[in-house]
Amino acid sequence: MKQSVGHRIFLLSPAYAGGERARMILRGQAQFPLARQLRGKSGAPIADVFTFLSGLYFRGKIAYAKAFARAPRGTSGVLVITPTRGLIDARTRIHLDDLREFAEVDIHENDPRYRMPIDRDARLLGKKLSDQSEVILLGSIATGKYVDVLLANFGQRLRFPADFVGRGDMSRGGLMLRCAADLQELSYLPVAGAIVNGKRPPKLAPRRYTGHFASGD
């Protein structure tokens, strides 16, 4: 049975697993803490790994989503889109082999290695949510790689932050980190029919963070 009250679930676009920072962490001789975690038996949370790979953008996404998610009982409110594993809880621990697998697949809406798992998970999630619930995509809506499969499963429930329009990744990351620290939630627009290009907003003023916002934890 669907929930009778609205919930808010966040879907975070993934960090690129084929770049230089990924190669750093995949090197067998890497000795920094996160690399050792990935090689260890317990692995490392995917949120920590993607924050390392992506920097400010993913750090902002995870902080923002944690601050404002409202999930049904038994469902994670913060899910990460992956190249091959569908939607997974941001707390899920991964290992080096998982990261290597992600690096082998460039996300494209027509690649079944990506499309089939995310379609499966989005369909299951959609059944748990009421029509009043919102699924917030913290990622690009300018191409079909995320939007096509998610819109097919969530319809009008799929939304994105209005303030993303006109901003690049770094600006979006800084904005979300600031909003999470101030507990000021952004407004959202339906993805269906959205205008994806707009005037670039003013540059954010520099800001220092303390505590867990300083490290992205």
Which residues are covered by each model-predicted region?
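Peripheral peptide segments
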Residues: 1-217
